């Protein structure tokens, strides 16, 4: 794990995180994801912001693909592993990230169109990617911060 000092952005500190700790965090996240899904709790994602501030290296690695994978896979095991959370794609600070909602969807779709499996075959079908994007768009339209 590499952490950057906000006051000295060019300096970083490396911290060893044990595999057992990582496995524990993964199990807690999976349990929370299933709880969120069962209660209909929505999760907002900000792909460009998440790429900059997290450990993912590309849009194709974004956690949204693990949180909700209906229509992009028919692998029963992968479908069962995913909590199928009510997710949405959003933008973070437009002044900092210079993006739009349309751009965030396009970045995810373009990244997914390039992903290949172990044999070098395209992992996702373009039509399925756009169905997945549309499902997420609809979930985003239903999410609200209202108490009603």
Feature map (PLM): residue ranges:
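Mid-to-C-terminal alpha-helical segments outside catalytic/metal-binding sites
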Residues: 30-39, 103, 107-148
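Amphipathic alpha-helical protein-protein interaction segments
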Residues: 22-25, 53, 94, 98, ...
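Histidine/acidic-residue-rich catalytic or RNA/ligand-binding cores of hydrolases
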Residues: 53-64, 97-110
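Second-shell residues forming the walls of enzyme active-site clefts
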Residues: 16-42, 50-75
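Secondary-structure transition/capping motifs at alpha-helix termini
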Residues: 39, 70-81, 114-119
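Short acidic/histidine-rich active-site segments
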Residues: 45-48, 83-100
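Short beta-alpha connecting loops at secondary-structure transitions
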Residues: 51, 88-91, 120-125
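Short, small-residue-biased leader/transition segments that mark boundaries at the very start
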Residues: 1-3
């Amino acid at each position: 794990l590499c952490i950057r000092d906000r006051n000295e952005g060019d300096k970083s500190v490396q911290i060893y995180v044990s595999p057992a700790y990582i496995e524990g965090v993964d199990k807690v996240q999976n349990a929370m994801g299933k709880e969120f899904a069962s209660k209909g709790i929505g999760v907002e994602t900000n792909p460009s912001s998440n790429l900059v501030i997290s450990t993912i290296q590309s849009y194709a690695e974004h956690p949204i693909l693990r949180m909700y994978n209906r229509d992009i896979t028919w692998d029963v095991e992968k479908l069962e592993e995913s909590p199928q959370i009510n997710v949405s794609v959003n933008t973070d600070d437009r002044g900092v990230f210079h993006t739009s909602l349309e751009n965030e969807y396009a970045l995810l779709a373009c990244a997914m169109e390039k992903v290949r499996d172990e044999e070098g075959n395209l992992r996702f079908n373009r039509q399925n990617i756009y169905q997945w994007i549309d499902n997420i768009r609809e979930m985003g339209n239903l999410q609200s911060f209202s108490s009603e």
